[in-house]
């Protein structure tokens, strides 16, 4: 919402959402002083209506943020469980690789038995590729989910701060 304030020497346009998003009560007091001494004192009423509208929407917006926060929290927990399972699978396969290497290294190199054991080591290492790729994807997904959760929590907290600030502004207006 924009306020068009006219006074003796000219006029000014105030983008109310951006102006109030700074949350500086001193700036609001100055703006109210300018509005009250201007040719358009009805801007104060427009400002009051805008703030009341924002305050009325507070509960609905908070509920929406809360729903998203709960959903993202559950998704993060599930993703962390999946990562733990994948890491466990990788550790089991790595144990198999170690055992196969130990058995292979107990024989002379380039003998028939050594070659058979070496084939086993290669099989285990091949089996490691898929879980490692999966783990990489899961970590990326977890990072994205945590980022989305953080953004919603930030919006939730910002909304609470806005409500407190709007209460102060309403006290200044009345």
Model-identified regions with their sequence ranges:
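Short amphipathic alpha-helical segments that mediate assembly, nucleic-acid/protein binding
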Residues: 24-31, 43-48, 54, 96, ...
């Amino acid at each position: 919402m924009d306020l068009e304030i006219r006074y003796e020497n000219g006029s000014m346009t105030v983008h109310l959402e951006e102006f109030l998003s700074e949350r500086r009560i001193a700036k609001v007091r100055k703006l109210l002083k300018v509005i009250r001494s201007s040719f358009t004192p009805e801007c104060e009423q427009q400002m009051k209506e805008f703030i009341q509208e924002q305050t009325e929407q507070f509960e609905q917006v908070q509920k929406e943020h809360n729903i998203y926060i709960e959903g993202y929290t559950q998704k993060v927990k599930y993703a962390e469980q999946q990562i733990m399972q994948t890491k466990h699978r990788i550790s089991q396969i790595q144990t198999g690789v170690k055992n196969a290497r130990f058995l292979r290294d107990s024989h002379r190199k380039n003998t028939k038995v050594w070659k058979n054991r070496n084939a086993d080591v290669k099989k285990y290492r091949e089996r490691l590729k898929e879980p490692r790729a999966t783990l990489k994807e899961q970590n990326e997904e977890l990072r994205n989910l945590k980022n989305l959760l953080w953004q919603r929590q930030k919006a939730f907290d910002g909304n609470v701060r806005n409500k407190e600030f709007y209460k102060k502004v309403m006290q200044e207006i009345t």
